[in-house]
């Protein structure tokens, strides 16, 4: 609802649509240009993230992009602290979550079939963005 209000207020409702749901259970809409998963990465284990990234890949049109934004550990898994703390908090709360590394996230994209996979600083030492494109 909030996203749809924002889209309408900015006059792009004829260009952008959203669909609510539980991305771990519900099917994704088909023929999408872009899929975004943001700021909930540590809440889920590797199996769930693999499934979600694969569902996004399957829903995208050829050339479509996925953007995964979240708290990610460096490849050596020694930091940054925010990503480690989020992962620890998930373990302590008995969720399925854990701290994923940048390397883990790139692997999720590769396994799904994405190409042109890139890792970008989104908010330094807090959020990272991994992007990939579905082959044309």
Indicate residue ranges for each PLM-predicted region.
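Alpha-helical subdomain
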Residues: 1-136
């Amino acid at each position: 609802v909030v996203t749809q209000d924002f889209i309408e207020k900015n006059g792009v409702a004829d260009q952008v649509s959203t669909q609510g749901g539980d991305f771990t259970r519900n099917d994704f809409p088909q023929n999408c240009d872009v899929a975004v998963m943001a700021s909930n990465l540590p809440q889920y284990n590797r199996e769930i993230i693999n499934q979600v990234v694969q569902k996004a890949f399957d829903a995208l049109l050829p050339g479509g992009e996925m953007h995964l934004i979240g708290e990610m550990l460096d490849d050596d898994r020694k930091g940054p602290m925010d990503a480690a703390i989020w992962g620890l908090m998930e373990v302590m709360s008995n969720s399925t979550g854990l701290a994923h590394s940048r390397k883990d996230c790139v692997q999720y994209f590769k396994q799904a079939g994405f190409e042109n996979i890139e890792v970008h600083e989104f908010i330094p030492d807090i959020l990272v963005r991994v992007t990939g494109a579905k082959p044309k």
